[in-house]
């Protein structure tokens, strides 16, 4: 039986944060931003042969429109001469970190040696809720499901209250 091995992050990069709908990147496709991030990460590891990359896992909260049709596969197809497989993961605000965790797990259990993982999102191209929100009303018919509708702001307030973290402590 193969032993669980360690997984390492050998390069990390990100694009600058823009303002939704009116920022510098408002007309830049999210797959193009992702390609720039991937290429920047590759520059940090010049000895890594792109052919060694086995798969890409990219998190995306709203994988539709300009960030649809499997943004992981599209971006790696644009970034590399040789095709790299890809899968897009949706866990809303935790999509990117979930993608990284999934890639690390594949390495840890010996399913892969080299992975690309991260997140991509353009709130200018695909707004909150997607281009055509159509929420199932049955989800909100039960009181215990109300948390599904919480945004990160409300979630942060509840966590801060639960753990008694004041605004002043957060800003310090």
Question: What role is predicted for each listed range?
Answer:
Residues 1-7, 19-52, 65-69, 76-172:
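Acyl-thioester C-C bond-transforming condensing/cleaving domain
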Residues 11, 58, 117:
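Redox-cofactor binding/interface segments in oxidoreductases and associated redox assembly factors
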Residues 12-17:
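Short polar catalytic/cofactor-binding loops
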Residues 51-59:
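Short glycine-rich phosphate-binding loop at a beta-alpha junction
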Residues 58-66:
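A glycine-/small-polar-enriched, mobile loop at the entrance of the PLP active site in fold-type I
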């Amino acid at each position: 039986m193969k032993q669980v091995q360690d997984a390492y992050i050998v390069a990390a990069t990100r694009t600058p944060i823009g303002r939704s709908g009116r920022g510098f990147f408002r007309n830049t496709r999210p797959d193009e931003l992702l390609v720039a991030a991937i290429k920047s990460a590759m520059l940090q590891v010049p000895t890594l042969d792109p052919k060694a990359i086995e798969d890409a896992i990219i998190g995306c909260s709203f994988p539709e429109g300009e960030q649809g049709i499997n943004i992981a596969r599209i971006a790696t197809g644009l970034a590399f001469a040789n095709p790299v497989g890809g899968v897009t993961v949706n866990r809303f605000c935790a999509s990117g970190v979930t993608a990284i965790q999934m890639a690390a797990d594949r390495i840890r259990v010996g399913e892969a040696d080299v992975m690309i993982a991260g997140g991509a999102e353009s709130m200018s191209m695909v707004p909150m809720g997607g281009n055509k929100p159509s929420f199932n009303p049955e989800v909100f018919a039960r009181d215990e499901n109300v948390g599904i509708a919480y945004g990160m702001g409300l979630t942060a307030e509840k966590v801060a209250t639960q753990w008694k973290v004041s605004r002043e402590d957060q800003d310090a």
